[in-house]
Curated annotation (Swiss-Prot):
It comes from the Bacteria. GO terms for molecular function: RNA binding; tRNA pseudouridine(38-40) synthase activity. Belongs to the tRNA pseudouridine synthase TruA family. This is tRNA pseudouridine synthase A. Coiled coil: none annotated. Its EC number is 5.4.99.12. PANTHER family: PSEUDOURIDYLATE SYNTHASE, TRNA PSEUDOURIDINE SYNTHASE-LIKE 1. Keywords: Isomerase, tRNA processing. It catalyses: uridine(38/39/40) in tRNA = pseudouridine(38/39/40) in tRNA. Homodimer. Formation of pseudouridine at positions 38, 39 and 40 in the anticodon stem and loop of transfer RNAs. The lineage of its organism: Bacteria, Bacillati, Cyanobacteriota, Cyanophyceae, Nostocales. Substrate binds at residue 119. The active site is at residue 61.
Length: 282
């Protein structure tokens, strides 16, 4: 704990946060549930001697992972902003890591200053399960998936659209407009990766969308039907969300991002989902 008699200076500190979502009930603090926000706030409180509020760029659901979530808090004390990462890490459990910390201006906000969020969903398509990838993917082996059809279904989503069909109940958001900036679906060995970048995401949007894409890729639903469904906002037909463990928040982008590019996720998925290692293990 910091010495309360030291001169206090207030600074806003931004964090890049990585976490394994398996044993968390999401990002946002909740009573009687373990959450990422609560764990980090508790760690900071032990350092400062009082509670601070941590603001995240996105509220990931229960079981969802993050390679580079971004958050900020206001601190009083003499700890330099760039040292906060290592200080907080010494108080955190092993399934959360602060990758970097930096000073930002008092008007910078992890959520409201963000230009985009990018998510990746991973599907594992081999018949046999693999315990090393199960925590990070949806093991879908019920029917072959055509990733080219899934990519074709994604393309019309580019741009600004009313995506109420992929909006779970329980959200406080007053509208369902989303500007989709990038979409991609590609196969890497036994894995299909779906990436979506947008200015913001509706509650449950990616998992509902992936659930429908799998229906397209498996031939259960046509491309035309999929497009009509979301354009006509037929939410009642979107019944199955993809499992949470396959989803990962990859990055959050800002016009004035205060970190160097090495905090990004780029090498992480290659280590977790290495095609060569899986092939060689057979």
């Amino acid at each position: 704990m910091l010495d309360s008699h030291q001169p206090k200076q207030t600074q806003r500190v931004a964090l890049v946060v990585q976490y394994l979502g398996t044993h968390f009930h999401g990002w946002q603090r909740q009573k009687q549930h373990r959450t990422v926000q609560e764990e980090i706030e508790t760690a900071i409180a032990k350092i400062l001697g009082h509670h601070v509020t941590l603001h995240g760029a996105g509220r990931t659901d229960s079981g969802v992972h993050a390679a580079a979530q971004v958050a900020h808090f206001d601190a009083t004390g003499l700890i330099p902003a760039h040292k906060w990462a290592s200080v907080i890490n010494s108080y955190l459990p092993k399934d959360i890591l602060i990758k970097a910390s930096a000073a930002v201006g008092d008007r910078w906000h992890a959520r409201f200053s963000a230009a985009y969020r990018r998510y990746r969903y991973t599907i594992y398509t081999e018949d046999r399960p693999n315990l090393f990838v199960t925590p990070f993917s949806w093991h879908y082996y019920y029917a072959p998936l055509d990733e080219s059809l899934m990519q074709a279904a994604l393309k019309p989503l580019m741009g600004k659209h009313h995506l109420a069909a992929f909006h779970r109940a329980g959200s406080k958001r007053s509208h369902s407009w989303v500007e989709v900036q990038a979409v991609e679906c590609h196969r890497s060995g036994p894995f299909i990766h779906i990436e979506i970048q947008a200015d913001g995401f509706l509650y449950g949007m990616v998992r509902l969308l992936v659930g429908m894409l799998v229906q397209v890729g498996s031939g259960q639903r046509t491309l035309a039907n999929f497009t009509e469904l979301w354009k006509e906002q037929r939410r009642e037909e979107v019944k199955h969300a993809a499992p949470s463990q396959g989803l990962c928040l990859l990055r959050v982008g800002y016009p004035d991002f205060p970190f160097t590019p090495d905090v990004w996720y780029d090498t992480m998925p290659k280590l977790v989902f290495s095609q060569e290692s899986l092939v060689n293990s057979h």
